[in-house]
């Protein structure tokens, strides 16, 4: 999966997207507390980050993410050894939670181990005041839309509980 995200593009915004996906920092560097967790199964993974940000920087980064389906609709990235990969970026729906939200689906087509392969990632970011939940899920066997949406809903509710001074339930399914 990493080989697909370390490819290089001549388009600045598109390269910035690939770099952010590889580094797991779609919203940039947090300016406050942050927590990061991830799960892998086979060629798929689910990643979630909750963090505090500078409000202006957070809003700017979310605005930038919303431009990517137009700016980086479809582009070519070159992997190590000169292998070309076709990258497509489309808008994705995000549950109506939080103060602001944006979603993307990124599809990278190329060869892996000498055979055609497609990496699909579903991405969602939700802002709550100056904090945000970022969820990314997918892999070589497809996106994880349902898992990403569920993680966004639960993560946003848990973040709101913490920001309101409460302690979230120890089990994500037991929302207060």
Task: Give short role names for the model-derived ranges.
Residues 1-111, 115:
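A small/polar (G/S/T-enriched), proline-flanked helix-loop surface module common
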Residues 76-83, 143, 166, 173:
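Residue-level signal for alpha-helical context at structural boundaries
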Residues 87-158:
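A short, solvent-exposed beta-edge/loop patch
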Residues 55-56, 67-70, 153-164:
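Sec-exported extracytoplasmic/periplasmic mature domains
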Residues 159-176:
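Short, low-complexity, Pro/Ser/Thr/Gly-rich segments in the mature regions of secreted, periplasmic
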